[in-house]
Amino acid sequence: MLLLRALFLELKTNKNCKALLLLLIPLLVGLTLIIYGIVLFSTEGVIDHGDHNHLRARFQLTLEEIIVFVVGSIILFFTLASFCVSCFMLMRSPKQKQLEVDHANKTNLKPKAIVNCDLFQLGDYCVFTFKKLSFKQRFKQDFFARSKFSFRSELYRLCLVGVLIALNLALSLIEIPGIVLPWGSSIQFRFFNTAILFIAVRLVGLLSTSLVALITPWLHLLIHPIHTPISSLFYMVNDFLVLWIFYFFFFHLFKAEVIQTTTVVDNKPFSQLVNTKKTKWTKFFSLLVISFLCGFIEGLGFYFGYFLILGNVSSLGLKIYYDGLQQRDLINSSNVLFFLMTTTAIFSIKYIFEMLFFFSVEKNVVNIANHFGLY
């Protein structure tokens, strides 16, 4: 027990230990593959999941079960071995003195405020703006979400990551089925799963939010193992790409984030978040661009996902048929165009609602991050 407490304290105090969190991803992949193989074996390969019942044809030689068990076991073994070796090397590493930690905290301070007005007297109204950071400095600060070391902020961030994973997992379980496409087939999708990721960027930083995006689909498969590992892989890649597209377009390309100002009234500082007219227009254009771009990417992922689940990508002879109708496959160029247009429109509406939700709570999210010292 004492060794575990010492290891946990070292993981909290050493900033390089965050790389160990990346091992959670292959760990979850290995566990979910094993559980998926168990479910597939116990149900004899037949799992009813709406209109996708035909995707679960029983293999007579149980080749799929063997592959799933072997791959999952190998990934799980190497992940646990890597984690144990990393923890062993971490405990053998030289300890950092408390004086060095205090000195690092004092030298890595937040940028100071600069007064816009030259002279002001008691009762005057003056506006303070924060010093602009370069792209490299801003990206580093957003990625690690830490301007200075603090046990309290690290504890808050750890708790928030757990809460965000739970919220994202709960919302990913809400699936909207029965979206009928023009040729008669229907698809289902998750409507709220990426909304939490947009909010989490300003709470726990880009690195922790990326971990949430990579981990949640495998937790979903762990709880709801009637999906395929391919669908979890699709949602993992899609959520990760959507998150980074949102970050670079919203915070760097359009610079549409809310502006934080500090005013001095009667010789007393007063901070507030302001959406100027320029900021509102940039928010509007960023909403349109991000929504349509992310909608197209998710629709394109659905298109390739059908080939990975239902057929062999390398063989053009394996086509996807809907409702038993001939010439209604997704090899035909016109059907591909209609499919991408339909899915892009549906997913774009989804991301528009998620972006509007983010805009409505943006100020509250920034206030929470400032209050708990997360930035």
Curated annotation (Swiss-Prot):
It is found in: Cell membrane. It comes from the Bacteria. Disruption phenotype: Probably essential, it was not disrupted in a global transposon mutagenesis study. Its main location: membrane. Signal peptide: none annotated. One of its GO terms (cellular component) is plasma membrane. Keywords: Cell membrane, Membrane, Transmembrane, Transmembrane helix. It is a multi-pass membrane protein. The chain crosses the membrane at residues 21-41, 66-86, 160-180, 203-223, 234-254, 289-309, 338-358. NCBIfam families: MPN160 (NF045740). This is Uncharacterized protein MG147. The lineage of its organism: Bacteria, Bacillati, Mycoplasmatota, Mycoplasmoidales, Mycoplasmoidaceae.
